[in-house]
Amino acid sequence: MFKEFKEFIARGNVIDLAVGIIIGAAFTAIVNSLVADLINPIIGLLTGGTDFSGHYLVLKGEVPPGASLQVARDSGASVFAYGAFLSAVINFLIIAWAVFLLVKAVNRVQSAASRQKEAEAEAAAGPTQEELLTEIRDELRARRT
C-alpha cells in the first residue's frame, strides 16, 4: 500500500497539481493585496475617501452611526455588505483574467510545439513507398528511351 501511495505521489500530474495549488494561494494573496491596498483606496477616493470594502447597509438591528462593518456584524445586526462583495468580485475578475492569460499562453506554446512536431514528422518521413516506386518506374522508362 505504501508503494502504491509512493507511485501515486511520484506521478507528474499530482506534483504539478500541488505546485499549482501553492502558487495559486500565493497569487491569491497578491491579488487580495492589490485590491485591498491599491484598487479600493482609489475607489474610496472617488466615493468620498472611505474604505470601500467596509461599506454596508443595515437591514435589521441597531448599529451606531459610522460603525465599521466588523462592529456592525459583532453587534448582531443584519447587514448588506456590498463593499466586501464588490471587493470579492474585483478579486475574482483579476484572478480570472490572469488565469485566462496563462491558459492562452500555454495553449499558444502547445500549439507551436504541435506544429513543429508535425513539420518534423513530415520532413523525417520522406517519400512514401508508392512515391518511391513511381520514381523508380519513371527512371526506368527514361533509361529505355
Swiss-Prot record:
GO cellular component, one term: plasma membrane
GO molecular function: mechanosensitive monoatomic ion channel activity
Alphabetical list of Pfam families matching this protein: MscL
Subcellular location per the Swiss-Prot or TrEMBL entry: Cell inner membrane
Keyword annotations from UniProtKB, A to Z: Cell inner membrane, Cell membrane, Ion channel, Ion transport, Membrane, Transmembrane, Transmembrane helix, Transport
The organism's place on the tree of life at top rank: Bacteria
Gene3D superfamilies linked: Large-conductance mechanosensitive channel, MscL, domain 1 (1.10.1200.120)
Membrane topology designation: Multi-pass membrane protein
Transmembrane segment boundaries: 14-34, 83-103
This protein's record includes keyword Acetylation: no
Subunit structure: Homopentamer.
Free-text function comment from the UniProt entry: Channel that opens in response to stretch forces in the membrane lipid bilayer. May participate in the regulation of osmotic pressure changes within the cell.
NCBIfam families: mscL, PRK00567.1-4, PRK13952.1
PANTHER family: LARGE-CONDUCTANCE MECHANOSENSITIVE CHANNEL, MECHANOSENSITIVE CHANNEL MSCL
Entry's family note: Belongs to the MscL family.
Name of the featured protein: Large-conductance mechanosensitive channel
Taxonomic source organism: Paracoccus denitrificans (strain Pd 1222)
Gene it is expressed from: mscL
